[in-house]
Amino acid sequence: MRRIVLFAAAALLAVSTSAQARDTRLELSLQELLSSQEARDAGIDGSVRFYLAGQPVRVAQRMGEDVTNKKTNAANKSDEQACRWVALSALKALQSGAQARGANAVVDIVSFYKRNEFRSSTNYECYAGTILAGVALKGTYARVN
């Protein structure tokens, strides 16, 4: 009887640990994404330029800050595919916000997943799970020269 109880407890422990949510962190190149056919297909048209924090840019006028927090279905996609797709959604939202304000760029972009800043002059941060992938970006709308 004791063996059965121990076996049942071990089985429950194994099931409960495998049921925990996956949250895999990826860093991916923003420039590679922006220059892809995927970006053009998603409507990233070049009318608004994107600059990660740390990239050199001459700002003529700052026009306010914004945060976008996008999620996408990650089922049946690789982590990288899901992250690229959701990053394009976040960039599209920033592009629309910039156009509405008369800005031609979004500068000082940082990843802002769960309100934690990640700064890189080359990469954005994405978190991929079993069901969802998410990208949060914070940036400043601007007119640049």
What are these regions (language model features)?
Residues 108-145:
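Surface-exposed short loop/turn segments
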Residues 14-18:
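N-terminal signal peptide c-region/cleavage motif recognized by signal peptidases
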Residues 64-117:
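Short, well-ordered alpha-helical segments
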Residues 20-72:
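N-terminal secretory signal peptides
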